[in-house]
């Protein structure tokens, strides 16, 4: 059964990957951009929708601000990434988690780790939900199955990612470059039409938009709040920075320079695409609202009619070409690039979780060296959590966006603060004037990045707090506490298991027990029991006895009869259990044996069946496993499981285990009966 499960797991996750092979992985910029920067570029597929959705609250007139909001997002992104490029050298050397932990302390580091992991989870949930939205735009009959489509995409993607980074690297660049080619041609053609006045109207341009706040004027405080909310919604276009900065190891040499260029290229492409899409959406009259049945109507005389909204990108493409062919191809390419964006998260999440687990803030099974496929545990964990978020929010991109960006801005802010602090300390001990000038320049640039990132974070949290940002903050705080608890647990384990430095204490820890008592659990006198007896006798303990529990008088009589018939030279002890609780009876017997001689060790030998098929497990009682689990918590007690493989016994029927015959002068074995009375689950000797 184990071999079959191993084959199934290997078929799913692929064969083992040599750590040296993974370390030697190097990506040129043309492959690194699709594999590591797709989550930022693909965000234009839904960032434009979010900007329009927020502005539409104030009516159609507010949509004129959408290109300017996109331009503000692009400028802020260029400033943040332009300053963040100066941090790549420090981040590449040890990773952002280790950098923040060393410069700012333990608690800021776990906050950063939790923020990054949440950002990866939401990248998958948002990208797959957006992909499902494009699929339902192509096939309106699937509108009611959006959540199911998103979950299916996540599951399939998880299986693909379990096959390894190399397979993804060979496939990732095609969808992104096809998407960029189709979208680039569409936007250039659309801009030419807009400048010449030949751009057609979008599908939703003829709809009647009812503002949610009809009495609000587009000036003063309301306008500032509206633009801030739309900026926060579109700030998802800034995602992807941490993935590239933490993946410098995968770039070709010079690694840091190539990573910095890829980072800048990603934000430039994203900014140009976002501004162009929003401009064409405004020129073609694209309208999107959160509740279309209430605030959007195709016929004013019949309100509250169902309207199937299509993404802004799809509507713009349809307005540019006026037919279904190229918009359909662009929608399919968008779905593909959103899938690649999730692949980026599936690369970053396991690496980030592995780096955190290496420092004992997450379970060690998430460490890369502990997994057959190096990152399989992290991939599975990300897939499960992403599915939970997608199902919880019904694959609603607008609802998921409210949780987004908080983690990204938090992690970037902490990293930049750590770098500034590192350079300030370095400046104090630097004497060479040229080196001091260079450090001062770097500190100034990084400080600008800190201020801008902090302003973005405050804006996002302030405008999205009640809409969902509070949930992100709560998740980050809870996960941070879990990380600290995990670290304290591992520290406690290290303290309890560390060998004392004092020689006398170390000698006491390594001292041999006074005596070793072997107890062989016997349920029936069959070959597995005889093998356990043979193993126990071969260990030459100080004393040895067999132990059986009287749950059935007829079975006990059979055990005694066969014991005497085989002349087994081991004393058979019988304990009564009127309430047929085998585990409690054996546990009580072992405890009393330990109590008599606290410095002695008791070794309990447990014969156990090993079956070939999973369904055969159901046919056998799990008494031995329950005994083993209960005895593990007893001090001074060790368990030795003696397996008996049934399938091996079938293939080699001639092998038997015969007891050693006692000498003729040896006294026949005796039976000792310990009567135990069990009252309401408690055991006690009578």
What is each residue range found by the language model?
Residues 53-102, 107-113, 126-154, 178, ...:
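Extracellular loop-to-transmembrane helix junctions
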Residues 177, 181-239, 268, 291, ...:
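Helix-loop-helix junctions that connect adjacent transmembrane segments
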Residues 149, 154-196, 203, 262-266, ...:
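Membrane-interface loop-to-helix entry segments
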């Amino acid at each position: 059964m184990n071999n079959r499960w191993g084959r199934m797991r290997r078929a799913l996750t692929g064969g083992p990957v040599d750590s040296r092979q993974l370390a030697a992985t190097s990506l040129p910029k043309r492959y690194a951009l699709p594999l590591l920067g797709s989550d930022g570029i693909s965000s234009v597929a839904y960032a434009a929708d979010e900007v329009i959705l927020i502005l539409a609250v104030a009516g159609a007139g507010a949509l004129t601000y959408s290109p300017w909001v996109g331009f503000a997002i692009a400028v802020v992104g260029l400033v943040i990434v332009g300053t963040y490029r100066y941090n790549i050298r420090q981040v590449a050397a040890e990773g952002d988690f280790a950098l923040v932990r060393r410069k700012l302390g333990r608690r800021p580091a776990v906050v950063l780790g939790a923020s990054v992991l949440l950002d990866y989870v939401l990248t998958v949930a948002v990208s797959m939900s957006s992909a499902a939205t494009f699929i339902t735009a192509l096939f309106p009959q699937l509108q009611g199955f959006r959540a199911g489509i998103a979950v299916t995409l996540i599951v399939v993607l998880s299986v693909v990612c379990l096959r390894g980074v190399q397979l993804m690297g060979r496939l990732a660049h095609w969808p992104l470059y096809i998407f960029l080619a189709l979208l680039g041609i569409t936007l250039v053609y659309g801009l030419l039409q807009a400048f010449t006045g030949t751009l057609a109207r979008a599908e939703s341009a003829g709809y009647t938009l009812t503002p949610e706040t009809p009495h609000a004027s587009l000036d003063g405080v309301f306008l500032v709040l509206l633009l801030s909310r739309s900026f926060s919604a579109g700030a998802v276009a800034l995602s992807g920075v941490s993935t590239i900065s933490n993946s410098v190891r995968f770039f070709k040499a010079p690694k840091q320079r190539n990573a910095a260029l890829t980072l800048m290229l990603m934000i430039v492409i994203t900014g140009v695409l976002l501004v162009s899409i929003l401009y064409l959406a405004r020129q073609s009259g694209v309208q999107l609202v959160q509740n279309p049945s209430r605030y959007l109507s195709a016929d004013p005389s019949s309100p509250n009619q169902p309207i199937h909204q299509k993404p802004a990108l799809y509507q713009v493409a349809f307005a540019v070409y006026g037919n279904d062919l190229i918009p359909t191809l662009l929608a399919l390419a968008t779905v593909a690039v959103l899938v690649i964006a999730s692949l980026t998260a599936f690369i970053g999440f396991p690496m980030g979780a592995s780096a955190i687990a290496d420092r004992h803030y997450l379970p060690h099974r998430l460490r890369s060296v502990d997994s057959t496929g190096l990152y399989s545990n992290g991939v599975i964990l990300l897939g499960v959590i992403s599915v939970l978020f997608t199902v919880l929010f019904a694959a609603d991109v607008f609802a998921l966006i409210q949780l987004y960006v908080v983690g990204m801005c938090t992690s970037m802010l902490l990293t930049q603060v750590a770098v500034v602090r590192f350079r300030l300390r370095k400046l104090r001990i630097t004497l060479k004037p040229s080196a001091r000038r260079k450090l001062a320049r770097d500190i100034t640039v990084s400080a600008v990045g800190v201020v801008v990132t902090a302003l973005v974070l405050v804006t996002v949290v302030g405008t999205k707090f009640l809409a969902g940002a509070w949930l992100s903050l709560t998740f980050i705080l809870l996960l941070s506490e879990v990380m600290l608890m995990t670290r304290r647990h591992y520290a406690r384990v290290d303290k309890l298991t560390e060998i004392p430095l004092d020689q006398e204490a170390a000698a006491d820890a390594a001292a041999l027990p006074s005596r070793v008592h072997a107890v062989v659990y016997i349920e029936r006198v069959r070959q597995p029991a005889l093998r356990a007896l043979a193993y126990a006798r071969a260990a030459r303990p100080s004393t040895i006895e067999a132990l059986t529990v009287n749950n059935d008088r007829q079975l006990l009589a059979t055990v005694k009869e066969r014991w005497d018939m085989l002349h087994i030279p081991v004393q058979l002890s019988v304990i009564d259990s009127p309430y047929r609780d085998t585990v409690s009876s054996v546990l009580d017997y072992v405890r009393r044996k330990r109590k008599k001689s606290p410095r002695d060790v008791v070794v309990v030998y447990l014969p156990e069946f090993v079956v070939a098929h999973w369904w055969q497990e159901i046919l056998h009682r799990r008494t031995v496993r329950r005994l083993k689990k209960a005895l593990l918590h007893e001090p001074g007690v060790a368990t030795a499981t003696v397996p008996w493989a049934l399938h091996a016994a079938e293939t080699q029927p001639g092998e038997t285990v015969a007891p050693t015959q006692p000498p003729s002068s040896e006294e026949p074995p005796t039976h000792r009966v310990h009567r135990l009375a069990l009252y309401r689950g408690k055991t006690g000797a009578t």
